[in-house]
Amino acid sequence: MRKKLLSIVAVWLVALSASGQDIYLPVLQQIEQNSTTLNALKEQLEAQKIGNKTGLTPANPEVEFGYLWGSPAVNGNRKDVSLQQTFDFPTAYVHRGKLSDLQNNSAAFQYASERMDLMLSAKKVCIELVYYNALRQIYARQLGNAAKIASAQEKMNKTGEINRLEYNKAMINYADMENEVRRIDIERQRLQAELTALNGGQQITFDVSEYQSSVLPENFDTWFAEAEAGMPALQYLRSEIEVSKRKIQLSRADALPKLSLGYMGEFVPGQDFQGVTFGISIPLWENKNRIKQAKAEARASESMAEDAKVKYYNHLNNLFSQVKQLQVSVRGYADALKKNANEELLNKAYSLGEISLMDYLHEMEYYYIAYDKLLQTERDLELALAELTAFRL
C-alpha cells in the first residue's frame, strides 16, 4: 500500500516538471465531433458568411412598358418602353467586397471564441472528474478498511472483548465511509452527465485519476504575447476594428453620386423615338452623418479592444501568479506525504494492538485529510492552468 502511494505521489511530482501526454484530448476530440452546440454554431457561421456576401452586386434593372390610347382615334396609339440600370459609384463595390471578407473573418473568430469556451467548459468538467475519480479510489480503500474493522469489532463485541464505545465508533466510521463513497459517486455521475450533454447526448466516460500538469515559463509578459496573439476573443475585436475602418471608406463611397444608364423608346404611328438615357444623383441628404457614424463606431471598436486586452492581461496575470503559488503548495503536500506515508504503519500498529481503535481512526482521518488537500490543490492548479492555456484548445 505504501509503495502504491509513493508511486502516485511520484507521478504528481513528475507532472509538475514535465508535460506529459494530454489526458483530455480524446474526450475533447469526441465532444468537438459530436457537440450539437458546435454544429449549430457552424451552421450559424455559414449563414453569416452567406449573408455577408449578399448585396454586393448592383440593384436589379427596371423595365417599364406603357401603352397609351390616342384621342381622337385617328392619331393612333403610343407605346413607351424603357430599361434602366442604377449603379453605385464604382469604388463602393470594391469596399463592399473587402468589407464582406473582413466580416467573414470576424464571424470565424467569433465562432472560434465560442468553440474555445465550450471546449474549456468540457476540460474543466474533466478536471473535476479526475479529482473525484482519485478521491473515489482513496475512499474505496478507506471503506474496505472500515468494513474489516467493523466486522472484527462486531465479533469482539459479541464475545465481550471490547467495550460498547469502541464498537459504536467502528460502526459509525463504516457508515460514514459508505456515505462518503456514495456522495462521491453522485458527483461523478453528475459530471459524467455533463460530459454526455456536451457530447451531443452520446455516452462518454472519463476514468482518469491522475493529473499531468503543464509547466509555464517564468516570464509572464513573454508568455502573454503568445496568448494575446492566439486568443480568439481578442482576434475578433481586432478584426472588428478593421471592419469599422472599412465601413468608413464604404460610407465615403456611398456619399458619392449614383449613376444610372438605360434605354428608352417611344413609338407612335409614323414616328419612332429611341435612344439611351444617363442619370446621376445629387448626394444632398440621404447619407447625412453616415461618415460620422462610421468614425464613431471605429473609435468605439478600438476602445473595446483596448479595454478587453487590459482586462485579459490582468486576469491572466492573476492566474499566472496563482499557478506559481499552487505549484509550490502541491510540491509541499506531495513531499510531506512522500516522507510521512503512515498508512501502512498505522495498519500494522493497530493489527498488533499497539494503538487503540480511537487513535487509529483519528490518525487515519488526519492522514486522509492531508491527502484530500493535495488532490484539491492539484485540481485548483489544473483549473487555473486550463484557463491560462485555453487559447490552445
Enumerate the predicted regions with their spans:
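Acidic, low-complexity, intrinsically disordered peripheral segments
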Residues: S7, L28, L375-L393
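Bacterial Sec-pathway N-terminal export signals of envelope proteins
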Residues: G20-E62, Y67, F87, H95, ...
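Amphipathic alpha-helical coiled-coil segments
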Residues: A40-N52, E114, L118-R141, K148, ...
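Solvent-exposed loop/turn segments connecting transmembrane beta-strands
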Residues: Q44, L68-R78, E240, M264-G275
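A glycine-/polar-enriched beta->alpha junction
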Residues: Q33-N39, E46-N60, S82-L99, F109-M116, ...
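Transmembrane beta-strand segments that form the barrel wall of outer-membrane beta-barrel proteins
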Residues: P61-S71, H95, L256-F267, F278
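Periplasmic alpha-helical coiled-coil/stalk elements that build and connect Gram-negative outer-membrane
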Residues: K3, D22, D117-G230, L326
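Bacterial Sec-dependent N-terminal signal peptides
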Residues: M1-L25, L393
